[in-house]
């Protein structure tokens, strides 16, 4: 708590000070640790006002995660798309695309699902679970869009492994 108070005091005294981004970043980490979603949203929101800051990727991830968990999928989708576009590592890009995929599924946005799943399936290092999830949701989106042949291709790949939930279906 003393660190939190110190950073908060600093921001009250110097809202645009040289270390304000650092303070917002550390306050968002403290908020995450203490499960203070409102605090995390507040401080990551401030960080996102500076898209070129060294904290923007992590801020997008934390911000998007909370919005997703609060079922605010449209807003979370925007964060995940930004993360996908700006990520400096393959791992973070994959987290962004996975977020886009899951938001797309929950928003019933077939085009978003197809694009995200296709992007995920193009990733070099994809876990079998994530590959199956992407194939499954893309197949369902293709069916919704009446692209039966494309859906069948994805479903055939999934059916090879009936040990998984997706393959069994």
Locate each region found by the language model:
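Acidic, polar-rich low-complexity tracts and alpha-helical solenoid repeat scaffolds
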Residues: 1-169
């Amino acid at each position: 708590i003393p660190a939190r108070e110190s950073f908060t005091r600093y921001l009250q005294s110097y809202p645009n000070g040289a270390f304000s981004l650092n303070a917002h970043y550390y306050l968002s980490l403290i908020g995450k640790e203490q499960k203070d979603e409102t605090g995390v949203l507040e401080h990551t929101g401030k960080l996102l006002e500076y898209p070129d800051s060294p904290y923007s990727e992590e801020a997008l991830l934390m911000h998007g995660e909370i919005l997703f968990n609060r079922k605010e999928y449209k807003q979370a989708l925007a964060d995940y798309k930004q993360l996908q576009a700006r990520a400096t590592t393959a791992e973070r890009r994959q987290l962004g695309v996975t977020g886009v995929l899951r938001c797309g599924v929950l928003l019933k946005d077939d085009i978003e699902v197809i694009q995200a799943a296709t992007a995920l399936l193009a990733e070099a290092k994809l876990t079998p679970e994530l590959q199956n999830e992407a194939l499954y949701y893309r197949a369902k989106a293709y069916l919704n869009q009446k692209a039966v042949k494309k859906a069948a291709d994805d479903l055939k790949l999934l059916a090879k492994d009936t040990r998984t939930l997706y393959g069994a279906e």
